Amino acid sequence: MKEWPPNLAFHNKVIDGAAIKQLISRLIQRFGMLYTSHVLDQVKLLGFKQATASSISLGIDDLLTIPSKRWLVQDAQQQSFLLEKYYQYGNVHAVEKLRQSIEIWDAISAYLRQEMTPNFGMTDPLNPVHIMSFSGARGNASQVNQLIGMRGLMSDPLGQMIDLPIQSNLREGLSLTEYIISSYGARKGVVDTAIRTADAGYLTRRLVDVVQHIIVRGTDCGTTRGLSLSPQNGGVPESTQTLIGRVLAKDIYIGPRCIAVRNQDLGGGLVNRLITFKKKPIYVRTPFTCRSTSWICRFCYGRSPTSACGDLVELGEAVGIIAGQSIGEPGTQLTLRTFHTGGVFTGGTAEQVRAPFNGKIKFNEDLVHPTRTRHGQPAFLCYIDLYLTIESEDIIHSVPIPPKSFLLVQNDQYVESEQVIAEISAGTSTFAFKDRVRKHIYSDSSGEMHSNTGMYHARKFPFSNVHILPKTSHLWILLGDLCGSGPVLFSMYKDQDQMSIHSLSVQGRNTPSLSVNNDQLKHRRLSLYDKNGTGGGSIPILNYSEMTRSLSTARCNLLYPAILHENFSLLAKKRRTRFLIPFQSIQEHRRKNERILCSDISIKIPRNGLFRGNSILAYFDDPRYKIGVSGITKYGTIEVDSIVTKESFINYGGVQPKDEGKVDPLFFIPEEVHIFPETSSIMVRNNSIIGINTKITLNKRSRVGGLVRVKKIHRGIKLQIFSGDISFPRKRDKRFIPQNKDILIPPQIRKRNFNKSKKAKNWIYVQKMRPTNKNSFFLLQPVVTYEIADGINLARLFPPDLLQEIDNIQLRVGNYIRYGDGELIPGISGKNPRIQLVRTFLVLNWDQDKKDSSIEEAHASFVEVSTKGMVRDFLRIHLRKSQIAYAYMRKRNDPSGSGFPSDNELDHSNRNPFSSSYPKARVRQSLNGTIRTLLNRNKECQSLLILSSSNCFRLGPFNNVKYHNPKKESIKRDTDPLIPIRNFSGPLGTVPQIANFDVFYHLITKNRISVFHYLPPEKGKLQVIQSFLMDENGRIYKSDPYSNIFLNPFNFNWYFLQHNYHKNYPNYCEETSTIINLGQFLFETVCIAKNGPRLKSGQVFILQVGYVIIRSGKPYLAIPGATVHGHSGQIVYGGDTLVTFIYEKARSADITQGLPKVDAMFEVRSKNSISMRLKARDEYWNEYITRNLGIYWGLLIGAKLTIAQSSLSLVNEIQKVYRSQGVQIDNRHIELIVRQITSKVLISEDGMSNLFLPGELIGLLQAERTGRALEKGICYRAILVGITKASLNTQSFISEASFQQTARVLAKAALRGRIDWLKGLKENVVLGGMSPAGTGFRGLVHPSSKKYKTLSLETQRKILFDGKVRDLLFHHKRIV
């Protein structure tokens, strides 16, 4: 046997794809291309020989399922079942359920993927599937996991997750449902594949077009800048790929020895040595730092990507086109590869921290606060780095917890080994791809919607039925079957006739109460349309002060207005379902000759004339808050998130407002603001001071004098004139005025800081100004202060109620500011001479204090009544009410006669089927249950809400049930028994407020608490019974040190311990339970008694001594900010949208539809992704640095920093997308594209120059060189442009016209007289010339060298030329 050479190394390991790449690279560097190709041919033949000898084939018997899959899937199913139960109980909302479901199945799929390799290694190491999956030929671990593991969650073509997971694998076979879901992520025919391939091809075309002019035209540009790369920060493969092929920008020293010099290219051996040493950061040259504008040098680019010997790139190489094709071509291949990945969904899960052993948890409670996890579980959130200690008998272990992590255990809690104690959020990047997803929750069944908290109108939809939840609450759907009947015919009845449409008889009863006279009646329909026919106009109302009496009619439910009897006195009558507002009164013979003047009160009525609860009825514009000048509004404490900012409830009986709080004043800073078109000629300069009546344009003069600021806006120019005094700051002024902040100074503070000693009469607005190249100063502007009134007093509008009846209808009066804090009010034009700052609104509501209100909506109409020559117009609002008729359809032989349904009647099996087309007589015979009559959405039909046995259930009797036995426990009392009355928050926003005390000092709240002992009545002071909270283990919680009432916010069943202050029993406690109230909402998890029947979710419908009947309902947990499509008491149908959640969700990691992520980053237009975040970072840098360094230096440094930071961030994020799919792309290709995206700057309006226009896009290097040549700074801002916009803003209009918008580009080029110097490849190809690349580049170079070959250049001339260049670049005015 031949001996092995001693100097040849032998590597005894498996060679995979990565090792083969390294081997080929080393062979090329060591022996060259010819020898390497010979070696590779031998390797190929060896592979064919071994494959033929081994005969490896893939059969179905080789697919071995992982043994642990069965119990893992069962565990996941159990967790999903519990999660669904929590959702039905209302403990978690839909978004939390979705997140937890994703993490459950994703964790199972990841665990199976990890167990796959050890399973093959132990059971069958020579399995063909195991060998082929890691050979690098075809397939990967993810695809093998789908064969023998499970597919898990799938994503649709848009990247959204499908809720139903695929539990089977391809070896076991898929069911029909799983097969249909599985086909979503795969290729769906030729058309879909062609579309996605076309998208990838279009991306390649745009990438090539934006960099087609970048050609290697020089060896060294002379730059001294470079890119800092640290080998120890990233992984070894990433660092090696980033460094190989680069050129050093600085020398590298290891101690005193220089191992690499500047402009030396980095090979594989040198890079490995540098990574091994892990010394200081390495500075390499990059396309970002090349000083050329439209080309690149050899040293800044590095080695050629097409050269096998590792030489530097040749002159004339079209590296731009190579970069565009290198980035775009993998997109087409990845588009076709989506069939193999199958659209499997992958989402980032949180990292869990588990206890290493049994012990007790210790941590600092001051650094955490209670919260809910994204799964809806109670936890603690830590603010900063927290050290959690686990103490056992002999071991103390400390676990560091990073900020924004969740602690799932309590302090001093005993944990077991491997128990999850903390959850660390997934380390998502700042520029992680997230989508704002709207998830709609639909009703499963029909019924009534109720909410246990208040809702306010959405600002965008003031008249719609869309509401916003201010806090976490539950939405209840109380079940009920809807049975519709035929239309209600009112044509057989006359006006003012009484009829009962809620009667259960077949025929109605006609009982006229008022005779009809000969007075005229004119009824105006509510379908209001303006001149354009769009509808929804404003109806003016006359002054209410002329009216001294109001009018209403008796109780009826007609749809038409009433005719008033002549003897009917115009006094207040029953206003239970209707009321009328008089708004016009005039003699009939004067009606046609006189013109009625309208006040500022206007009514806003929806087009259909229907009002919901809390609907805005009317507006009133107070003339005190009208302004005729432009300016800025300022206020600090007034809430403007909702339309209602200050409100008071006022009944129509003349009750005065109560508990009116004081509102902070509204400040208005007058400023003259003008918006001119872009073509306007501005006759004043920016940052200049003008006087009154100064000509600012050809046909416009200023109304005030002051400082002028000119700013370019979108499609126009904004000109502001700031009136006031100017004060230059001193040192003490800088201490008095906060930096970078405008303030308001009250009149109590003297102006000694502004060179004046007299006392100010009004408020002063101080604003810091920074003009270009000048010192900063303070601008002192006068302020107009408005005190917002307390609203309209309705006592003078409506007379007192003589009958002293309680009204259902209520008005809510409030004020809201029409403009936001700091919002600029534009100039006042002739069409709109005055602007209203504060508007008073009137909100219509009814039955505010009643939980059992069944009124759904109010119908508005206008009535014109003529009595004895007097014409009166009324706005009539008719409440459409559905009365609850507790009439149960029972048989006549009911022996009990109690009026309640028996057990047989409430049984679902005894209920006969029914149809909605049955008449009322048939309904009466066939339905068993409570009938609630209500108006349908179609206002012509009636509906019956049937509360049958399927919607109600009975619990009882409770005769043999044992309640909780009282527990006695000694508690030390350290405080006085006098306990202050204090409101406290209960679970999920429920606020039980203390109402009053009875003679026994019994505490009454919304959730009534039964107590066994009362305080002795001889004490004269009111005292609250001291209560404690006991959990299921008998522990007593004390959460608030300033209150003696302790609640557990995560437990819905409240137990209280009550002190007994009797002399004989000074210190003992008793446990009590909650009493069920009529109308109370109960959850299924609540237990009211031991050994009692299990409750279902719903509302207590009937409450008796021996039993209780609960109407079934389903709770939906809603988070703050959720949109509710309806109001409390509204009838909903199955499938209706109840609530909409808005949350952020990470996109799927699988690339579909032709690289949408990469396309979004290159175009800089995607929402909630890196592009928008980079734009926000640019704006922040520009604003922050400008304030501290001034406009010129701030914009210059800010632009440099933002461009550099944005370039690096874009390169890293694009590489992440490609590396996630196993695609390796050289960083230099991406850097060339990103260089074009970040190479443009936007000329700023600050410091206008005669060379560029404000808002013009120019190159960064062009702006720098122009500023040096003119010896004057040019103000500009950094901007990110997409590849499409960058292709349309180049130096060649021929290249732009051949890309997009040909006619527009050529027309603009002709008008501007642009010159195309034909520097790029595309313009030369279009005109049929030779492209300046490759041999064409050499043809351009050689003639010039021959022409000047005979000229002798003197040394002095050369030095003089250097001096001129130095004079141009470094401001030298003389040659020395």
Swiss-Prot record:
Subcellular location: Plastid, Chloroplast
The reaction(s) this protein catalyses: RNA(n) + a ribonucleoside 5'-triphosphate = RNA(n+1) + diphosphate
Molecular-function annotations in GO: DNA binding; DNA-directed RNA polymerase activity; zinc ion binding
UniProt xrefs under SUPFAM superfamilies: beta and beta-prime subunits of DNA dependent RNA-polymerase
Residues at which Zn(2+) binds: 221, 290, 297, 300
Keyword Hydrolase assigned: no
Top EC class for this record: transferase
Keyword set, alphabetical order: Chloroplast, DNA-directed RNA polymerase, Metal-binding, Nucleotidyltransferase, Plastid, Transcription, Transferase, Zinc
Alphabetized Pfam families for the sequence: RNA_pol_Rpb1_4, RNA_pol_Rpb1_5
Named cofactor requirement(s): Zn(2+)
EC number: 2.7.7.6
Entry-linked InterPro entries: DNA-dir_RpoC2_beta_pp, RNA_pol_beta''_euk, RNA_pol_Rpb1_3_sf, RNA_pol_Rpb1_4, RNA_pol_Rpb1_5, Rpb1_funnel_sf
UniProt keyword annotation of Transmembrane present: no
Superkingdom field: Eukaryota
GO-annotated biological processes: DNA-templated transcription
Free-text cofactor note: Binds 1 Zn(2+) ion per subunit.
GO CC, alphabetical: chloroplast; DNA-directed RNA polymerase complex; mitochondrion
Oligomeric form and interacting partners: In plastids the minimal PEP RNA polymerase catalytic core is composed of four subunits: alpha, beta, beta', and beta''. When a (nuclear-encoded) sigma factor is associated with the core the holoenzyme is formed, which can initiate transcription.
Family the entry assigns: Belongs to the RNA polymerase beta' chain family. RpoC2 subfamily.
NCBIfam families associated with the record: rpoC2_cyan
HAMAP family to which the protein is assigned, alphabetical: RNApol_bact_RpoC2 (MF_01324)
Function field: DNA-dependent RNA polymerase catalyzes the transcription of DNA into RNA using the four ribonucleoside triphosphates as substrates.
Protein's name according to its UniProt entry: DNA-directed RNA polymerase subunit beta''
Source species taxonomy: Eukaryota, Viridiplantae, Streptophyta, Embryophyta, Tracheophyta
